[in-house]
Amino acid sequence: MSAQQSRFTRLPRVPRAIGLVAAAATLALLAAGCTSGGSTGSTGANGYGFNAPAQVKDSGITILVDAGRQAIAEAFKADHPEIKVDIQTYDGNAGGTNSFQTKISLADKANSGWPDVVWSGQVNDASWAAVGKNGAQAFAAPLDEGVTDKGWLDGYTKGAEDPVTVDGHVYGARDNLAPVVFWYNKTLFDQFGYKIPETWEDYQALGDKLAAEHPGYTLGSIGDSFTAVLADMWSAQAPIYTVDGKDFTANFSDDHSKKMIALLDHMLANKSLSLDGLFTPDFPKNSKGKLLGIPGPTWFTGALFQNKDSLDGQPGEWGAGAALHWAGEDTATGNVGGGFWYGSSHSTNLKAVGEFLQYATSGPQSVKLITGLPAYASTASDWLDAQVSGGFWADGDDFKSNVAAAATHIWSGWGATLSFSSEPAWNEVVAPALAKGETIASTVDAWQKRYENDAQVNGYTVK
């Protein structure tokens, strides 16, 4: 996800209830255990089903997190005084920076300095972290080989761990799911007498009506790559990039791709969509009290609606509608982020690593501190119940059912496990054109070519 999720989500607030979804460290300071390089083996070592180093019972662990995940790491440290915990922050691999892989590559070269646990806001890191390279042992430990409690991984929502499952082994613990729903301002919908859209066609028609009757009000923004590409194109089942093993396809001629590009261009033209970045000062300045609705992931709860520095919503003002879909087609939606925790195969205290991973995703503080819909099924159920009982959301029962349903309708045709970030293509090709008043449609050839070039550079065969 998304990058913005990692970078900007603040710990949310819920009035009188459980809280909601919300300086790079140098490798020289990372005090993790280390071994000589080698490939992960199925024969196991030191009690684990892989080539683990000798375990040291009292060895401390280093946890590398972004600002949004620091609270859960601090909670673990407070609740486990018997474990020496060093918490260090970095950008969370946000925005396709590749900082996670860069740090691990440097540690591999030095043969020391690996963190014991790393948070990443991206969903594709298993493509490299679970694979040994140039004689170096794969960084990510297979969690199902003794790191986590037996059977614990079975508690995940179906499909949540698919992006980190490689050759039958699970290499990461998913923090949250980030399915896209339609967020609506109930206060404004009631005031204007509008009906909440159910389809993309409804959404476009509502944009026309809003532009004509209430100029200055909007139905969202595509000022960020993740809103346009992940929230909109993915939700539209637009196959602008798909992967099958090492085969890559960018299909901009598919009807779903063409329809969504036309929809976005149309709504930009009538100004029912803006180009404000959601985490820039312009967004709250221009959108607070004037945003009728927006398609977006579940972590918008804390990042936008319950963030005093953003929309600063009030109880009963915002609700979650069903995921938008094309008329006459099955419901499908996109996913924006929902990052993973990785344990290091080099750690000398894998017991503590496993305890942290389970604590962070399904422990006693996870409902309060996970910044989005938790990926662990029992935690997700408790989180949804907390939203309804907290009283913040309009139409609480609809909130619960619509968010839960969206989590089961994420479109599987998207290239979610792409080994490189898709964000630079939008940021460097499409966004500058839009800033000059050009259309998305006018950039399609260059946009597609950028994806194909990036794919080739990263070892894919372009089909």
Residue ranges and their predicted role:
Residues 129-141, 167, 304-328:
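Ligand-binding "clamshell"
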